[in-house]
């Protein structure tokens, strides 16, 4: 009886030690598991947004979507939402396929999913919600062709915007041209005397013809003085026979002629220099454009890059079109 009583406490102690050992081993797995510590290979999908940040524990949070370069540049287009699917394990890390809607001129280049390791950058466990996408944005073939086309029309578009811009001197230039045109009109095209009187067999002498009448020379031999008007010894023009058809004669040009000639020359210079700096090669009202504009001016081709409402371009279709594009890449732990 004494031996049995002594053996029972030992068995109880052994049982308690085994139970304690089991709790120490299985406790963290059963009761103390951290829900934010997950195995990266168990993540099946990621939905990332351009206006959100990742969670963080050891490091600072990063944007869920981050452009890091590419042929198109990061300012060309920004996707709103990207979804990445776990495509499997390649022996090194998880591989991803990321899809989003992009403009038809752009596509994903190199992509990589970056996740924060839970304890270190080498930890196979990651912090839940710490993954983000880093991507390159490249041009498609259509985007490259649009880029080349926009380069052809660059000079024309720049000139139009300079003329229509409030900050440019286009309005001042136009105002100066109008003033010069008015001066030339007054000097050359405006006739203060009105239209000549109708034809008459015996027209009266006008003021201009009287000025020239006193200076007419002697008629040649064989001509009557009735057809030549009064004679004078000074050199000048006749107002008799000629005035019957012309109605009036004009005085010689004075200083107004030379000032008008100078203004006209200045106006022609300004028009010439303005046309030389633009792609216009024809007349002002009917410009002739380079061969690249032919067939494209009234076409509905895709508008050049950077085009917008009110911009003068070779395309009338400014509607943006999108398509679903995919990018493929691996994982980087940070």
Swiss-Prot record:
**Any keyword Chaperone?**
no
Tell me where it mainly resides: endoplasmic reticulum
Q: What does the record list as coiled-coil region(s)?
A: none
- Record flagged with keyword Transferase: no
From start to end residue, where is composition biased (Low complexity)? 313-326
UniProt-listed GO biological process terms: calcium ion transport; regulation of store-operated calcium entry
Of the GO CC terms on this record, one is: endoplasmic reticulum membrane
Where are the membrane-spanning stretches?
169-189
Keyword list (alphabetical) reads: Calcium, Calcium transport, Endoplasmic reticulum, Ion transport, Membrane, Signal, Transmembrane, Transmembrane helix, Transport
According to the UniProt topology, which residue ranges lie Lumenal? 32-168
Cytoplasmic compartment spans: 190-334
InterPro entries recorded: SARAF
Protein location: Endoplasmic reticulum membrane
Q: What does UniProt give as the signal peptide span?
A: 1-31
Topological category with respect to the lipid bilayer: Single-pass type I membrane protein
Pfam families hit by this protein: SARAF
- Where does the record place the region Disordered? 308-334
**Free-text note regarding domains:** The cytoplasmic C-terminal region mediates interaction with STIM1, while the N-terminal lumenal region mediates regulation of SOCE activity.
Q: Say which family it is in.
A: Belongs to the SARAF family.
How is this protein organized at the quaternary level?
Interacts with STIM1; the interaction is inhibited by the interaction of STIM1 with EFHB.
The protein's role, per its UniProt record? Negative regulator of store-operated Ca(2+) entry (SOCE) involved in protecting cells from Ca(2+) overfilling. In response to cytosolic Ca(2+) elevation after endoplasmic reticulum Ca(2+) refilling, promotes a slow inactivation of STIM (STIM1 or STIM2)-dependent SOCE activity: possibly act by facilitating the deoligomerization of STIM to efficiently turn off ORAI when the endoplasmic reticulum lumen is filled with the appropriate Ca(2+) levels, and thus preventing the overload of the cell with excessive Ca(2+) ions.
Please identify the protein, giving its name as recorded.
Store-operated calcium entry-associated regulatory factor
Q: Which organism is it from?
A: Rattus norvegicus (Rat)
């Amino acid at each position: 009886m004494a031996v049995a009583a002594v053996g029972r406490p030992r068995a109880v102690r052994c049982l308690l030690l085994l139970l304690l050992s089991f709790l120490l081993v299985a406790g963290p797995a059963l009761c103390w598991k951290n829900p934010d510590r997950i195995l990266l290979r168990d993540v099946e999908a990621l939905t990332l947004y351009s206006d959100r940040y990742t969670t963080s524990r050891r490091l600072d949070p990063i944007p869920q979507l981050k452009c890091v370069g590419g042929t198109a540049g990061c300012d060309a287009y920004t996707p709103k939402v990207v979804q990445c699917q776990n495509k499997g394990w390649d022996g090194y890390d998880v591989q991803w396929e990321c899809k989003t809607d992009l403009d038809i001129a752009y596509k994903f280049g190199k992509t990589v999913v970056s996740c924060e390791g839970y304890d270190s950058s080498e930890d196979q466990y990651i912090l839940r919600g710490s993954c983000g996408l880093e991507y390159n944005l490249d041009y498609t073939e259509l985007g490259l062709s649009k880029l080349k086309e926009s380069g052809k029309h660059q000079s024309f578009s720049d000139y139009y915007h300079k003329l229509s811009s409030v900050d440019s001197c286009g309005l001042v230039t136009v105002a100066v041209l109008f003033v010069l045109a008015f001066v030339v009109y007054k000097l050359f095209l405006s006739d203060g005397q009105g239209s000549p009187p109708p034809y008459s067999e015996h027209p009266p002498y006008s003021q201009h013809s009287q000025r020239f009448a006193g200076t007419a020379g002697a008629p040649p031999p064989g001509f009557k003085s009735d057809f030549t008007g009064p004679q004078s010894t000074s050199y000048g023009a006749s107002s008799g026979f000629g005035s019957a058809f012309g109605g009036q004669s004009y005085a010689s040009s004075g200083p107004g002629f030379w000032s008008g000639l100078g203004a006209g020359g200045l106006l022609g210079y300004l028009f010439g220099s303005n046309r030389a700096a633009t792609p216009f090669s024809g007349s002002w009202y009917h410009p002739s454009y380079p061969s690249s504009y032919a067939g494209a001016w009234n076409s509905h081709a895709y508008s050049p890059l950077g085009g917008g409402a009110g911009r003068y371009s070779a395309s009338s279709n400014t509607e943006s079109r999108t398509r679903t594009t995919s990018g493929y890449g691996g994982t980087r732990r940070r």
